[in-house]
Amino acid sequence: MLQEAKVSTHTSNPLSQSVPQYGHSFDEATRVERLDSAPESLASVASTKLKDTTVWYRLAIQSEWCSTPQVPHGGFLASLLLSALLEHQQSQQHPDPYTLSYDFLKVLSPGEAFISVTSLGKVSGSFTSIAAELYQSRKEKVLLGVSVRGSFVNLSKQQGKSVLPLHYGAVSKLEEVPVPHPRSWYLPPSQAMISRQLDLLVKLETQRRPFSDYFVRFHPDDVDTPQQEDYSEEHASADLQSSPHYCKGSRILPLRSSHSRRIDAKSIPMFGDFRRPAYENVIKQDPCHPHDVPTRKFAFPTLQYTIRFLAKVPHDTEWLHTQWRETVVDGRIISDVYITTEQGAEPVAICQLDSLMFDMQWALSTMPSAEKSKKSPEASQL
């Protein structure tokens, strides 16, 4: 998930010697620039917001952080929004994220985009409520791609039992996370696809899948895939204690790679959905194009994504231990993700993804190809 671009030292730039040998692409890709005013292309949107409490940021959605060449990775977009929120809150009384609830509304494209951050005021003396929206201008139209609403706190001042509003209540393990009924407000455009899947999956009632355990980190030199180690009972040993080079109950992990970016709060949204990226949808306009062949039988575009931060991510954290539980409910897949540190000693966050499940092969077969659509109205069959 991390590209480490070597910076050339053979340059006429006098500042080149101060540049580190490795540049972390995640930090570059999630960088936001604060604007003095709303961009002209979003004037119609800016007129509906309070100028005194709204701040605008400019950013670039990079193609390297896409599930497909033109579909941004949902976890990356979530981290982009959190980057703007952290930038906005860094000098405020409450600098740490506590709860974030994302709604994925429209599929955006690589290119320039803008984020509006609006302070909703202090709901109490313990936390601040804040909202952000990710926009993109396309063909003189304004697209609202992702919106997020959440609360920020000062985790260093939290002592004893929390009085903040909790999404799940006190949770110390994945089994304690409830499975609520999905309540998504926005659906993909193809109603036929939705109806077909609802008819099929409603008959299954509720199906709970087994737990899945992963150890994940930023890959030292690959921007496209996370480096992960699957949980294995064969490598578990009750007698062997955890150490800097061994995670109890897992394979031996190279924990001390100097080239792997350390994990922080900004990267949690991306790690929370690495196994099911929001916007994971490789259906394109031309199903016969060689790059449009589906990579899996089913696609799971995420509609809602909620994160509750349980604690600050410890300094120098390289690996995270993630537990996944999936539940099929009425045409949706509810994914609960419990995230702890590499040794499982400290819980970091709980994530929940509400995703739509549909058969990609069926969907592709109902979409006309670009060439055949001119000759015949019949659907293309793969």
Swiss-Prot record:
InterPro entries: Acyl-CoA_hotdog, HotDog_dom_sf, Sec_Metab_Biosynth-Assoc, TesB_ACOT8-like_N. Residues 1-22 are annotated as: Disordered. This is Ustilagic acid biosynthesis cluster protein orf2. Pathway: Secondary metabolite biosynthesis. Induction: Expression is strongly induced under conditions of nitrogen starvation. Expression is positively regulated by the cluster-specific transcription factor rua1 that recognizes and binds to the specific 5'-T/G-G/T-C-G-C-A-T-A/T-C/T-C/T-G/A-3' upstream activating sequence found in all promoters of the UA biosynthesis genes. Residues 1-20 have a biased composition (Polar residues). Part of the gene cluster that mediates the biosynthesis of the glycolipid biosurfactant ustilagic acid (UA). UA is a secreted cellobiose glycolipid that is toxic for many microorganisms and confers biocontrol activity to U.maydis. UA consists of 15,16-dihydroxypalmitic or 2,15,16-trihydroxypalmitic acid, which is O-glycosidically linked to cellobiose at its terminal hydroxyl group. In addition, the cellobiose moiety is acetylated and acylated with a short-chain hydroxy fatty acid. Disulfide bonds: none annotated.
